[in-house]
Amino acid sequence: MEEKKMQYLFGMHPVLEAVKAGRKFDKVLLKQGLEGPQFRELMELLKNNEIPFQFVPGERLNRAVRGAHQGVLAYISQIDYVDIEQLVNNALGSSQNPLLVILDGVSDVRNLGAIARSLECAGGQGIIVPAKGGAAINADAVKASAGALMRMDTCKVSNLRVAAYYLQQSGFKLIAATEKTENLIYDVDMTGPCAIIMGSEGKGISQAMLDLADEKAAIPMAGEITSLNVSVASAVLMYEAVRQRIRK
């Protein structure tokens, strides 16, 4: 997404104070070669708060900001995130059989938004995304979700595998959507609490997440094209869960 379309703060002191105050950011751009005590303090805070950051040439910041950015540009989060414990508590508190989605490397913001929209329509409770290596939840994602991202819990985690294991220990079945199985989606019981794992558009689900999954499920393909767009595939699995729960 173009930087001028996003909400942001710039300047070393404003960003430093905002991070100290607990303001949520999608990412922070830092000019290459920054030094000094305030820079070191900011770096420590970004790491401790697991806020993604990137070093970029000063020209990029000059194009994005008409002002004294001092080498720091921070993009404000479009939504308020919850931690994994709060996500689980809210999900189990609102439904006997909650439905969650884990996005393992989905990089397109419109796909992310479309997945969130389908999940909300299917009665799902929340979505889990990686802090790094996935699509940013920005204005485009919120728009593509038709506001769904504002209506459900979103959890951003530094380690997807640890978060997924926590879900397992909390009673959720992990279902990986993959063609690397003979089990079709109709063969997998989705009537209880479950989290559907969806992989990246190009590589699919990582091996680490596949190894952790309780079940693997494939969508049957009858045509010559062998795969669906990730947002469409997500909706197919979600509504198979809905179908099973209605018939239960």
Identify the residue ranges that each predicted region occupies.
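RNA substrate-binding interface of SAM-dependent RNA methyltransferases
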Residues: 17-23, 92-183
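N-terminal positively charged helical leader segments and presequences
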Residues: 1-90
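Active-site helix-initiating loop/hinge in glycosyltransferases
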Residues: 11, 104, 111, 227-229
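Short beta->alpha connector loops at strand-helix junctions that form conserved
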Residues: 57, 77, 104, 130-131, ...
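Surface-exposed amphipathic alpha-helices with a cationic face
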Residues: 47, 164-168, 242
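Structured adenosyl-cofactor binding patch, chiefly the S-adenosyl-L-methionine
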Residues: 16, 21-22, 143-148, 207-248
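Active-site/ligand-binding-proximal alpha/beta "capping" segment
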Residues: 175-230
